[in-house]
């Protein structure tokens, strides 16, 4: 009986909290289908803002402001907040929340899909992202110019752990190495699902991303083309990964284009398979596996291919 009473009490508290959040949001029902999970715990909101180390002169990009729980606190710290929100109902709530206050003049709201929007200039980014746009948003952010100082981002826990994974880790993947090529990434804290309204089905984590400025002198499309091939089967040796007929056809096409531009004659008995194996052997990566290779390894491998006229984009 005590357990039943406890469960009933917990459900009652959840309903009461939901009613309070609905009241704060003007009676809005949140659309979880587009990732609307409002961060309700003020301690976590404050911690995220502290981690951003904002300056009074900063312009802050906030993605997914929701009902403005974090927006208001950002406005108190920064010179300006540019909030990107997809839902017009929440845009109205944001404006209503600061209407008639000194903070109103510091808020700019961009209405629409952040992935399809041109990002403004900003010094720092703070975002409680819809989790389904995590990967494309990270790379939109990292390829944005001019450089920003840092981003404090909320992600699904597993995605966050992939971002910070190192060679040899189970979760180490293409996302890990591509992100770490362009930025320093740190896991800051775990956030339980009950800190959101409505609660998501997964646990969350907060990550800090600082872009490398200047960026590494590497063509990212070339880099990603190589990494994509090797991580399709990250446990295979590179020798095996490059035996794929689709991969060889792509690289031979690129090689022939390169030779045509350079006015280089290709021997009649040319074999792309032999060429690839020769490069893998000479660079010492033939028996290596992507799961255990770090950024320096991939840079050496990419330079080895490019030096022989083989390109990945």
UniProtKB/Swiss-Prot annotation:
CDD domains associated with the record: AdoMet_MTases
Substrates-to-products reaction catalysed: adenosine(1779)/adenosine(1780) in 18S rRNA + 4 S-adenosyl-L-methionine = N(6)-dimethyladenosine(1779)/N(6)-dimethyladenosine(1780) in 18S rRNA + 4 S-adenosyl-L-homocysteine + 4 H(+)
EC number per UniProt: 2.1.1.183
One Pfam family here: RrnaAD
Gene Ontology CC: one annotated term: nucleoplasm
GO MF annotation list: 18S rRNA (adenine(1779)-N(6)/adenine(1780)-N(6))-dimethyltransferase activity; RNA binding
UniProt xrefs under PROSITE patterns: RRNA_A_DIMETH, SAM_RNA_A_N6_MT
UniProt xrefs under Gene3D superfamilies: 1.10.8.480, Vaccinia Virus protein VP39
Subcellular location: Nucleus, Nucleoplasm; Nucleus, Nucleolus
InterPro entries: KsgA/Erm (IPR001737), rRNA_Ade_Mease_Trfase_CS (IPR020596), rRNA_Ade_methylase_Trfase_N (IPR020598), rRNA_adenine_dimethylase (IPR011530), SAM-dependent_MTases_sf (IPR029063)
Keyword Ribosomal protein: no
Main location group: nucleus
PANTHER family, A to Z: DIMETHYLADENOSINE TRANSFERASE (PTHR11727), DIMETHYLADENOSINE TRANSFERASE-RELATED (PTHR11727:SF7)
Family, as annotated: Belongs to the class I-like SAM-binding methyltransferase superfamily. rRNA adenine N(6)-methyltransferase family.
Name assigned to this protein: Dimethyladenosine transferase
Source organism (scientific name): Mus musculus
Origin organism lineage: Eukaryota, Metazoa, Chordata, Craniata, Vertebrata
